[in-house]
Amino acid sequence: RQCLEDVWEPDATMGNYLYNWSLKADGTPGTQFTYFKIHKKALYEWACPVHEYLRYKGSGSEKKVFIHGMVLDHYPDPEKSRKSYLPLLEMAVQEEPENDRMTYYLGREYMYVGRWQECITTLKRHLKLPTAWWPEERCASMRWIAKSYHHIGDNTKAYCWYYRAIAEVPHMRDPYIEFAKLAYLLHDWSTVLYLITAALKIKEKSRHYVNMGYSWDHTPDDLGAIACYYLGMYERSLHHAQNALTFSPDDERLQKNLVLIRNKCKEIGISEN
């Protein structure tokens, strides 16, 4: 409450704050983004039957403040079924076919349930909607389209859509890391290294959209270590492996990888700094 009172202003209409949608086993953030449900009651109304959001109905301009120090942790019930989401989203889009927000959520839900072609079709339509201008959400649509193309066996199109996602929002790690994970599966080591190098240059999380936990944990350096190893760049592989282990020091696979890379470096005369 004190954090809210410290930043609230008389003309403020909404308060934004950090939201941890998921937490890792050690309590650190998994999926994290900025949330928005603190508001002046008279100026907003709830909209949509699922993934509800606040629709502004005031006469003046919105004024949002960010509440530093306020964090909401979400503890999802792993036993809870998502079966109700899809029909509600289909109903929402049927009622408002031009609603870009619901169209995006519907396409994403098709991905979650493995209906890949419907995901592709729906999210391509999302990208064509005149109100679908938010770069981060457009980027997310492109990422899910890419993922869906991979699952139906068209990796050429998956690559194309990941490149489009990066071009849409080059300052977020997520499209680079997800693309790198696909390239890893295909043993495309030079592409993995290129993407990881670019991703690690991004030092700040987005304050405007979802940040996936795997973009900010050991994953980038882990992928970098493996790619460099197979490219014969052993000293650089060692550096990435050491960094990966600092994020997850108890991970046995990362420990074994580091030992393997160290041994290779010793074998060819590279000393560890």
Where are these regions (language model features)?
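Catalytic-site signature of metal-activated, phosphate-bearing donor transferases
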Residues: 1-121, 125
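TPR-repeat structural position
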Residues: 82, 116-117, 155, 189, ...
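Structural signature of alpha-solenoid helical repeat junctions
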Residues: 98, 137, 171, 209-216, ...
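"A position-specific structural signal for the A-helix of alpha-solenoid helical repeats
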Residues: 105, 144, 178-181, 185, ...
